[in-house]
Each structure stands twice: as structure tokens, then as C-alpha cells.
Amino acid sequence: MLTKLKLSLRNINFNLYLALLLLGFVPTIYNTLRVFLLGQLPGEWSFSIAGQLSWVNLLYEIINEAIILPLFYFLGQTKSDRAILSNRIHTGFLATFGIYVVLTTMVIVFAEPMLACMATDPSIIPASASYIRIESVANLFAILTQFVLVALVTVGKIKYLYVFTGARLMLYLVADTYLVSTLPFSANLGVNGIGYSNILVNALLLAAAATLLAKEGIHIFARGAFSFGWMREFAKIGSISGLESLVRNVAYTMMISRMVNIVNEQGTYWVANNFIWGWLLLPVLQLGELIKQEVSSNRQNIRRNSLGYFAITTMIAVLWLVSIPGWKPFMVHVLGFDEVEKLFSLVLLLMGFYIFFAFQNVFDATFYGLGKTNYMLFESVITNSLYYGAAFCLYKAGIWIPTLTGIALLFGLGNVFDSIVSFAAYAFLLKKQNINILNPQPGEIENSPAP
């Protein structure tokens, strides 16, 4: 088995993994800086106001996963025909713009009712509404920038992805310093400054990306006769991914985000999520991106590399355990969070459940790499209807009373339940495709297309 494991690890593209880690580390840096800056602001509600954006972003995530995830495939299909590619980029950009304008308008108009529905503390609803309205505009620029970057990668300009990632970091550092910080020369815009910073940075990056794309002969703002016919097939594929995200995020919004608001712990939960998703899960999520790339390029990589994927995941989990003594100093001196004991206990509790998530990440990334989004939809329907459906009934019956620890346990056990369902789907897929991940033989290097 050890020989097979070494063989599997040698097959993995660690250079690409390192590049993905560096790309993922950039948003971790500026998000951590933002947590620190919020901790320096006067008043006790800064984290809670910023935390309201977490459930708003879930609305955008649903559309994002329905559009961006299938986009690489549909643009990649036509990269050899510049005329068809240009049409798809132009029409796709217009459709994305239209969808996000509608969503952004809805958030702006219904901000207060949505906050009330989410059981937000009435005293912070006006400030929270102002903030999420600003962020909704920023999200519009962000998704359009992401769309154009996908187009640039499709035409072979992947180097721009690295350039824009570095530029994004520098722009955020400068913008946040001048708009959010408490330094003497800062505009001192508080939490809203983060939203304005996002608008400024993403608008600049969108303009730059569109200019570079125009130099490649593709003008997203050009006038002319364009065909939207290809989007019928795009909608079929995107709807499955979007439906899976809808089921998953609606359950999370109502059973986790709303419950956290009910117990007035949105700030603590938001900072905990930033720490977990920004630092602990960074290598896990980027491993998932690597798996998607390797599996989509050659389905035989499931058999050849999966042992290595699980070994890397195990090493990441061990590193989490080793790093625990450094968490409190980091939370005090870097995050600047006052209630460190509460934050530390919450992260420590959630970490055990996220180990299950880390291994599930291998299963789910394999599904995405093969284009089997129907497996993801199956997971979401089973987990969110059975597990969270039962939890909701217990809550309405007054049997389960939400507390911060209780909500964390609810979410964590949901992760375990979802991981079990995902593993069952993964085992079914391997059996159906006749793939034995315990036998990464070196002799079979053929390029076999994904089913």
C-alpha cells in the first residue's frame, strides 16, 4: 500500500497545487486585514453588521455557481473559432449583467424586509441595510470581472489571472487603508468603507480586464447582431449546478445564518468562518480545484491520484491539530477579536466536523471534474430535506432551542451527514465507472475522455 501511495503522490501536479495555494492566499490576506480593521472600529456592532453579508452572499453564490462553473466548458468548446467564441463571450456577458442587475436591484429594494426576516437585531437593521446595499453593487462588478477573467484564460492569457490576483491584493490594501482604517488620513467610513472599497477595486479590475480582452479582438461592449441560441444548452447545465446551490444555501440560510442572528452571535460566527475558510480550509479548497482540473483533463487521474488526494487531506488535518496552540495568539494580535475564548471554543468545536468536510471535498471535486453535477444535487436534496428538515421540525416544535454551541453542533453534524451521503455517491460512481482507486498502476497513461 505504501508503494501505491508513493506512486499516486508522484502523479499529482504539485506545481499547479502550489500556484493554486498562492492564488488562494491573496484573498485570505486582505480578508484577515479587514477583520483586523473592523476590530479597531469604535462600537460593538461592527462584526455583526459585516456578518449580515454572509447570507446575502449566498444569494449571489447560487447565481455564480449556475453561471461561472459551466462557463469554462462552454467557452472552451469554441476557443478555436474566434468568431463563435467572441459571440459567446459578448452574449454571456450581457446575460450575466442582466441577471445580476435584477438580483442587485432586489437586494437594494428589499434590504430591510430581508434583514427582518433573518431575525437581525432591530438596532442594527438600518446600518446593515446600508452596508449590504453597497456590497450588492460591488458584487455586480465582481461577477462581471470574474466573467471577463474566465474569457481571458480561455483565449490563452492565463498569466493575467496571476497579474490580476496580485493587483487585487495591492488595490485592496490601499483602498481599505484609506477608507476603513482608523488612521489619521483615513476617510473613516467604517463598515461601509469595505463595500466602497469593493466597488472601487472591482470596477478598476473590470475596466482593465475588458481593455485587455479588447486587445485580443473581443469587444464585450460592441454593438451588432449576436446570437443567444447557445445559451439554451448553457441554461440546462447551469440550472443543475444552480439548483444544487439553491437547495444547499436555502437550508444553510434558514437553519444556520438566521439562527445565529436569533442568538445575537452573528459577529462571532462571521469571524470564526473567516478564520476557518480563510486559513484552515485554504489548502483543502485549493486541493479541490486541483482535483477538478486533473479529473476533467483525464478521468484516469481518479484511479491514479485519489490515494494521494486522501493522503494530502490527512496531512492537512494533522497540521490543523498541530497549529491549535497558535490560534489564540493569532485571534488576539492579528484578528483583534475581543471575545477570544468564545471564538477559540467555537473554532475548536467546528474543526472536528470540518475534517469530514475536508475528505468530502475530494468526493465532490471528483464529481465536478467529471461534470456529474447531478450527484451534487442528489447530496443536497438528501441532506437538506432529511437532516435540516428534521432539525427545522424540532425547532418549530420547541424541542431544539438554538444557542451558539447548539447551532455549531447542528451545522457540524450536518457536515457529517452530508459527508456520509457524499461518500455513498462517490462509491457508487467508482463502481459504476469500474474505477479502483486502490490500484494506481503506472502503466496506464492513456487520455481517456470524461464520460
For every predicted segment, state its role:
Residues 1-17, 127, 187-198, 207-249, ...:
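Interhelical loop/hinge segments that connect adjacent transmembrane helices in multipass membrane
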Residues 28-48, 115-122, 178-189, 246-282, ...:
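Helix-terminus/linker motif at the lipid-water interface of multi-pass membrane proteins
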Residues 38-61, 123-129, 191-192, 233-238, ...:
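Interfacial/gating helices of multi-pass transporter permease domains
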Residues 48-101, 105, 145-154, 269-323, ...:
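Small-residue-rich hydrophobic transmembrane alpha-helices
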Residues 83, 151-178, 192-195, 199, ...:
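Alpha-helical transmembrane segments of multi-pass membrane transporters/permeases
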Residues 102-129, 318-344:
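Short membrane-interface helical motifs at transmembrane helix boundaries
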Residues 109, 122-148, 276-279, 338-363, ...:
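Alpha-helical transmembrane segments of multi-pass membrane proteins
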Residues 169-206, 325, 385-423, 432-434:
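Membrane-interface helix-loop junctions in multi-pass transport and translocation proteins
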